[in-house]
């Protein structure tokens, strides 16, 4: 029974180390984002431009169809 606990303990230990390293990197990234407002603008553009483009792609053909009545 002890032999089956060793690998589990090792996996748990390695997992906690990975999580702590990821948290440190995430905290560092958040600090950098707070410092640079231009990056925030870029992130906002990345979020909203695809949304606007997809909405336009859906509605422009419908509007064009209604205007020209060639549906």
UniProtKB/Swiss-Prot annotation:
Protein name: Brevinin-1HN1
Organism: Odorrana hainanensis (Odor frog)
Keywords: Amphibian defense peptide, Antibiotic, Antimicrobial, Cleavage on pair of basic residues, Cytolysis, Disulfide bond, Fungicide, Hemolysis, Secreted, Signal
Lineage: Eukaryota, Metazoa, Chordata, Craniata, Vertebrata
Entry superkingdom: Eukaryota
Subcellular location: Secreted
Tissues of expression: Expressed by the skin glands.
Main location: secreted
UniProt record similarity statement: Belongs to the frog skin active peptide (FSAP) family. Brevinin subfamily.
Residue span(s) of the pro-peptide: 23-45
Intrachain disulfide bonds: 65-71
Record-level GO cellular component terms: extracellular region
Function of the molecule: Has antimicrobial activity against Gram-positive bacteria and fungi but has weak or no activity against a range of Gram-negative bacteria except P.faecalis. Active against the Gram-positive bacteria E.faecium 091299 (MIC=19 uM), E.faecalis 981 (MIC=19 uM), S.aureus ATCC 25923 (MIC=1.2 uM), S.carnosus KHS (MIC=4.8 uM), B.licheniformis X39 (MIC=2.4 uM) and R.rhodochrous X15 (MIC=1.2 uM). Active against the Gram-negative bacterium P.faecalis X29 (MIC=4.8 uM), is virtually inactive against E.coli ATCC 25922 (MIC=150 uM) and inactive against P.aeruginosa and S.typhi.
GO BP, sorted A to Z: defense response to fungus; defense response to Gram-negative bacterium; defense response to Gram-positive bacterium; killing of cells of another organism
Annotated signal sequence range: 1-22
